[in-house]
């Protein structure tokens, strides 16, 4: 499972001209399930994401997590993160989980995030979304938990 996280001062997602999710300062997270992923990978990735230290402490070092700063988390499904771009000029999405599994894992991830973190907003699986954000830094990290085979 993959999470591309960006530290933001604000972020929102719009579907059909309606804002369906928005946060202030926190993390905007593009989330992708890969073939072979299970709730085990989702749990591991969520734990890492909520504890990942990307916010500055009093000394200016990245030493605080989104949990520590009580920041928002905007979770946006994006299967294109699993693209295989190694050959040719057209990406292959073979590494991505099948849509049914991906939706199930996204929903599971969101449910677990809501249980573990106060401020959670989401995009809509399968929708054409417009995502807006103001990067803070910019600070961007790729987190990935590979399925145990």
From Swiss-Prot:
Compartmental location: Cytoplasm
UniProt KW keywords: Cytoplasm, Hydrolase, RNA-binding, tRNA-binding
PANTHER family: D-AMINOACYL-TRNA DEACYLASE 1, D-TYROSYL-TRNA TYR DEACYLASE
Recorded GO MF terms: D-tyrosyl-tRNA(Tyr) deacylase activity; Gly-tRNA(Ala) deacylase activity; Ser(Gly)-tRNA(Ala) hydrolase activity; tRNA binding
Broad class of the protein's primary localization: cytoplasm
Protein species of origin: Herminiimonas arsenicoxydans
Comment, domains: A Gly-cisPro motif from one monomer fits into the active site of the other monomer to allow specific chiral rejection of L-amino acids.
Subunit: Homodimer.
GO cellular component, one term: cytoplasm
Protein name (Swiss-Prot/TrEMBL): D-aminoacyl-tRNA deacylase
Motif (Gly-cisPro motif, important for rejection of L-amino acids) on chain: 137-138
């Amino acid at each position: 499972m993959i999470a591309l996280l960006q530290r933001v001062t604000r972020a929102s997602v719009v579907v059909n001209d309606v804002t369906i999710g928005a946060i202030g300062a926190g993390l905007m997270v593009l989330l992708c399930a890969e073939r072979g992923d299970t709730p085990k990978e989702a749990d591991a990735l969520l734990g890492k994401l909520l504890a990942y230290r990307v916010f500055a402490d009093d000394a200016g070092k990245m030493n605080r997590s989104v949990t520590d700063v009580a920041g928002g988390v905007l979770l946006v499904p994006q299967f294109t993160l699993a693209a295989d771009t190694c050959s040719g000029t057209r990406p292959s999405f073979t590494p991505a989980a099948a849509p049914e599994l991906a939706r199930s894992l996204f929903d599971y991830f969101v449910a677990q995030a809501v249980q573990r973190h106060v401020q959670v907003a989401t995009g809509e699986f399968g929708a054409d979304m417009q995502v807006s954000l103001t990067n803070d830094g910019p600070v961007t990290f790729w987190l990935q938990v590979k399925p145990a085979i």
